Amino acid sequence: MNYSKYETMKQLIADMKLPDYRYEQIIKAIFSQHTSTFEKMSTLPLELKKSLINTFGPSVCCTVPVACQTSGQADKILFSLPDGNRVETVNLHYKKGWESFCISSQCGCGFGCQFCATGTLGHKRNMTADEITDQLLYFHLNGHKLNSISFMGMGEPLANPNLFDALNILNDSSLFGLSQRRITISTIGIIPGIKRLTHEFPQINLAYSLHSPFENQRSELMPVNRSFPLHEVMNALDNHIRHTGRRLFLAYIMLNGVNDSVDHAKALVELLQDRGPWAHLYHVDLIPYNATDKTPRKFASSDKITMKRFRDILHANGISVATRTQFGSDISAACGQLLGEKDV
């Protein structure tokens, strides 16, 4: 079992027979005073500082930024992890100072979706809870507001059991104190993970990467569909809505000549109308495809006319739908473009 740094700090203080308030001083230094190194924690005794540095290293964060790219409203940070693996995190800036963060959960990804650059890397390993949350801690320590978080970076979050430890850390009022409703988890349809999320974090926003209403085509585009078929995932999502009463998001990447036909739109309408009393809580986000030269099969985004036709069919049939605005595609910071392998 991997204990988080916060649990390890508590144990270290207990082992040194120091009073409990020393832990509270560390947490205050990190989350209230934005102190990024243990050496600068002026309220701590020297003996404790040395022990913290020996255990964790000089920095509070285990993620080390090695490169940054900026384009308009998007910043992409390449982080190095303690074992040398690298992941990417995206910071999106909106009007009135709102900041959103797209974070990674795995080094690489083993699911091989045909249109996704990350999937070409294969699965290297799961990120630890500290590595997941330290992506955000880095930004917090540098004065950013963590207004909303999405697990839409590298990897499939629900395939990493450490995700749930990370969510507990993010939700802990003494640490990050993030409301569940400010967190979104995107999944390709890992049913055991969906069920666990339903019961442990019912207020977290859930987004399902759909991309085709047809089982055979979805299996071709997303091999995970052979293990977790669309119809079985939809049943799990119905149960999630039944249990939580929360809106559920369906992501649909628009691929020119692949999944953007009238037949696809009509099949999607039928799929959602079959949800019965839960149909009104499904919302479809149509996403222009972000081109990448990393995938063996090449795709292009549907044009605006085709996307409007698709959206109009859904809307005319009472389906909640919107076309999502994308940021950062010119620096490979948009959905499906993250690689984390090279200096950016």
UniProtKB/Swiss-Prot annotation:
Record's Gene3D superfamilies? 1.10.150.530, Aldolase class I
The entry's localization annotation reads:
Cytoplasm
Q: Which residues bind [4Fe-4S] cluster?
A: C109, C113, C116
- GO function terms (MF aspect): 4 iron, 4 sulfur cluster binding; metal ion binding; rRNA (adenine) methyltransferase activity; rRNA binding
Q: Which UniProt keywords apply?
A: 4Fe-4S, Antibiotic resistance, Cytoplasm, Disulfide bond, Iron, Iron-sulfur, Metal-binding, Methyltransferase, rRNA processing, S-adenosyl-L-methionine, Transferase
KW Transcription regulation (keyword) present:
no
Q: Which cysteines are joined by disulfide bonds?
A: C102-C335
Binding locations of S-adenosyl-L-methionine: G155, E156, S186, S209, L210, H211, N290
Q: What is its main location?
A: cytoplasm
What are the positions of the active site? E88, C335
Cellular component annotations (GO), alphabetically ordered: cytoplasm
Q: What reactions does this protein catalyze?
A: adenosine(2503) in 23S rRNA + 2 reduced [2Fe-2S]-[ferredoxin] + 2 S-adenosyl-L-methionine = 8-methyladenosine(2503) in 23S rRNA + 5'-deoxyadenosine + L-methionine + 2 oxidized [2Fe-2S]-[ferredoxin] + S-adenosyl-L-homocysteine
Tell me the cofactors it needs: [4Fe-4S] cluster
Enzymatic class: transferase
Query: What is the free-text note on the cofactor?
Result: Binds 1 [4Fe-4S] cluster. The cluster is coordinated with 3 cysteines and an exchangeable S-adenosyl-L-methionine.
Which HAMAP family does the entry link to?
23SrRNA_methyltr_Cfr
**What is the purpose of this protein?**
Specifically methylates position 8 of adenine 2503 in 23S rRNA. Confers resistance to some classes of antibiotics.
Q: What is this protein called?
A: Ribosomal RNA large subunit methyltransferase Cfr
Native organism is Lachnoclostridium phytofermentans (strain ATCC 700394 / DSM 18823 / ISDg)
> Source taxonomy lineage?
Bacteria, Bacillati, Bacillota, Clostridia, Lachnospirales
Q: Which gene encodes it?
A: cfr
